Amino acid sequence: MWVTRWLQPSNQPLLRTAYVEMVATEPEFQGRGFATAVMRRLASAIHDFQLGGLSPAEPMLYTKLGWVFWQGPLFIRTKDGLISTPEGSIMILRLPKTPCLDLTLPVSAGWCEGELW
């Protein structure tokens, strides 16, 4: 349900991030609170991370649970440098170990196969 990714706001230290992937509910079960219950449970399960992150298909679900959009530009770190990803968007969840963050700063994540965000 989540993978460890290392997000880095600007030139600040890397943040150990629980990056959530593949949240979906079968259409016939939507609207019954299943995804909300799973995401609430997930928030308690990832409390030892510095940050929660995801790329939302349905932002309203996450917004009502405290997730907020990163407002600054997004980049992917590669061995050759940073790649701008202006088409990407991410939301973050502040956790007990989350440092003070300026969400307008650029943020980068390490390269991964498949979808970058």
Language model features: what each stretch is:
Residues 1-23:
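A conserved beta-strand-loop-helix scaffold within acyl/acetyltransferase catalytic domains
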Residues 76-117:
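C-terminal "cap" of GNAT-fold acetyltransferases
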Residues 4-6, 28, 59:
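Short coil/turn motifs at secondary-structure junctions
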Residues 3, 36-42, 71-78:
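Short acidic (Asp/Glu) patches
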Residues 20, 25, 30-44:
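Conserved acetyl-CoA-binding loop-helix of GNAT-fold acetyltransferases
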Residues 48-52, 56-83:
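Conserved active-site alpha-helix within GNAT-family acetyltransferase domains
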Residues 21, 50-52, 87-89:
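Generic beta-strand structural signal
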